[in-house]
UniProtKB/Swiss-Prot annotation:
Protein name from the UniProt record: AP-3 complex subunit sigma-2
Subunit structure: Adaptor protein complex 3 (AP-3) is a heterotetramer composed of two large adaptins (delta-type subunit AP3D1 and beta-type subunit AP3B1 or AP3B2), a medium adaptin (mu-type subunit AP3M1 or AP3M2) and a small adaptin (sigma-type subunit APS1 or AP3S2). Interacts with AGAP1. AP-3 associates with the BLOC-1 complex.
Coiled-coil segments on the chain, per record: none
Origin superkingdom: Eukaryota
InterPro entries linked: AP_complex_ssu, AP_mu_sigma_su, APS3, Clathrin_sm-chain_CS, Longin-like_dom_sf
GO BP terms, alphabetized: anterograde axonal transport; anterograde synaptic vesicle transport; Golgi to vacuole transport; intracellular protein transport; vesicle-mediated transport
Any one GO cellular component localisation term in the record: Golgi apparatus
Protein function: Part of the AP-3 complex, an adaptor-related complex which is not clathrin-associated. The complex is associated with the Golgi region as well as more peripheral structures. It facilitates the budding of vesicles from the Golgi membrane and may be directly involved in trafficking to lysosomes. In concert with the BLOC-1 complex, AP-3 is required to target cargos into vesicles assembled at cell bodies for delivery into neurites and nerve terminals.
PROSITE patterns: CLAT_ADAPTOR_S (PS00989)
Swiss-Prot/TrEMBL keywords: Cytoplasmic vesicle, Golgi apparatus, Membrane, Protein transport, Transport
The organism of origin for this protein: Bos taurus
Gene from which this protein is expressed: AP3S2
């Protein structure tokens, strides 16, 4: 099972942190820091697997990572996961990010955090691998993007609600609003208009 997914830059700044096991925030920060220091001091030509038992609390935990440009993608897994399978999963995740953001970079992970988390949830949920077919993942992301565009995006909803209320032409301000069993008395708002 995957215990955590960490993405941080060359300076140790976390860009994506996802734990699938509950830890207090201080412990999470310590795990990110120690993982960064373990991974940073390794040469690029050394194996991408290392023991991480003392970090997460068991002797059978491993850190599997890949270094792309300025980012380290680290998966903390237990002994039931295949190291090569997780290495391929990291590749699928990065290539999917690359397809969705057209040449993904560190700034995409910062400014589109919601989309990055959605992509990650298409790949891994609850520490279990859901999907490894990149075309299927991208199809789900595109379907989500179409849905958001058709709804005008959730972030635009409050502005649409305010403009809809402003555009209502009422001959006079209602004093009572009745909705089923609910009766709402409207105060005199003319002094505020």
């Amino acid at each position: 099972m995957i215990q955590a997914i960490l993405v941080f830059n060359n300076h140790g700044k976390p860009r994506l942190v996802r734990f699938y096991q509950r830890f207090p925030e201080e412990i999470q920060q310590q795990i990110v820091r120690e993982t960064f220091h373990l991974v940073l001091k390794r040469d690029d030509n050394i194996c991408n697997f290392l023991e991480g038992g003392s970090l997460i609390g068991g002797s059978d935990y491993k850190l599997i990572y890949r270094h792309y440009a300025t980012l380290y993608f680290v998966f903390c897994v237990d002994s039931s996961e295949s190291e090569l399978g997780i290495l391929d999963l990291i590749q699928v995740f990065v290539e999917t990010l690359d397809k969705c953001f057209e040449n993904v970079c560190e700034l995409d992970l910062i400014f589109h955090m919601d989309k990055v988390h959605y992509i990650l949830q298409e790949v891994v949920m609850g520490g279990m691998v859901l999907e490894t077919n990149m075309n299927e993942i991208v199809a789900q992301i595109e379907a989500q993007n179409r849905l958001e565009k058709s709804e005008g995006g959730l972030s635009a909803a409050p502005a649409r609600a305010v403009s809809a209320v402003k555009n209502i032409n009422l001959p006079e301000m209602p004093r009572n609003i009745n909705i089923g069993d609910l009766n709402i008395k409207v105060p005199n708002l003319s002094q505020f208009v």
